[in-house]
């Protein structure tokens, strides 16, 4: 279910503060965050945010087409290692 239009998009306070500081100083540096539920807002465009996937932080460069999506959508948590091998020889 989507978020109500009456509410504002969720952005974690510490993440929003870091982005606003960098925008005021006009600096670009990697922002490390565990907040996968935060929504990407227009002030984040042009920044690189390292999003935690459960094991490591994946650096993601934010572009205008990502606005409105959640940060967690761009850092997959599972890696597909392939289906189980069909080994008929071992069954005999």
From Swiss-Prot:
Protein S19 forms a complex with S13 that binds strongly to the 16S ribosomal RNA. This is Small ribosomal subunit protein uS19c. Belongs to the universal ribosomal protein uS19 family. InterPro entries: Ribosomal_uS19 (IPR002222), Ribosomal_uS19_bac-type (IPR005732), Ribosomal_uS19_CS (IPR020934), Ribosomal_uS19_SF (IPR023575). Transmembrane segments: none annotated. GO terms for cellular component: chloroplast; mitochondrial small ribosomal subunit. It holds the Pfam family Ribosomal_S19.
């Amino acid at each position: 279910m989507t978020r109500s239009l009456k509410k504002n998009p969720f952005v974690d306070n510490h993440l929003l503060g870091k982005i606003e500081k960098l925008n005021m100083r006009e600096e670009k540096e990697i922002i490390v965050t565990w907040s996968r539920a935060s929504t990407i807002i227009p002030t984040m465009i042009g920044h690189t945010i390292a999003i935690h996937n459960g094991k490591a932080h994946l650096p993601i460069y934010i572009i205008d087409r990502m606005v409105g999506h959640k940060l967690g959508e761009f850092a997959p948590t599972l890696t597909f290692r392939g289906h189980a091998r069909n080994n008929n020889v071992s069954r005999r």
